[in-house]
Design a protein with these regions (language model features):
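C-terminal beta-sandwich interaction modules and adjacent acidic
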Residues: 1-133
Length: 133
């Protein structure tokens, strides 16, 4: 089981946030990587086919836990911090386009293929400050 919590909401461009990660299970782990990711996605028609394009616009590694940190029979608890970039595009969804922010946990077990868990987060539009003259 993999759980992830963030300290507050809404998230805005330039905001800082604390997070909490918990993973339990009986498998031995090599590593766990936690990343903040933004993906842009578009759906369009080409002839009679529907096409889906996805582009990773941003990725930042937040934490890497290796074997040294993963020697627990209980469960793994980990606190972390992350920031939404000041210039970040807010989350967005329309019929054919979307901008999606998420926290991605990549787990690499000792003897099984690696797997990922994604946790969507919503970034609200920032408040633009007007320059005073």
């Amino acid at each position: 089981m993999t759980l992830l919590e963030i300290s507050h909401h809404p998230l805005l461009p330039g905001s800082h946030c604390k997070g909490f990660f918990f993973h339990s299970g009986s498998m031995k782990l090599r590593s766990i990587k936690l990343s903040l990711v933004c993906e842009e996605q578009a759906t369009y028609r080409q002839g009679t086919d529907m096409r889906f394009e996805s582009h990773r616009a941003f990725k930042q590694e937040i934490s890497v836990l290796d074997r040294h940190h993963l020697q627990s029979d209980q469960g793994l608890e980990h606190e972390f911090n992350f920031s939404i970039p000041e210039s970040a595009m807010h989350s967005f969804r329309s019929e054919h386009n979307q901008v999606q922010w998420k926290l991605v946990v990549q787990i690499k077990p000792e003897s099984l293929p690696r797997f990922k868990r994604s946790f969507l987060i919503i970034v609200h539009p920032g408040h633009h400050r007007r320059e005073e003259s």
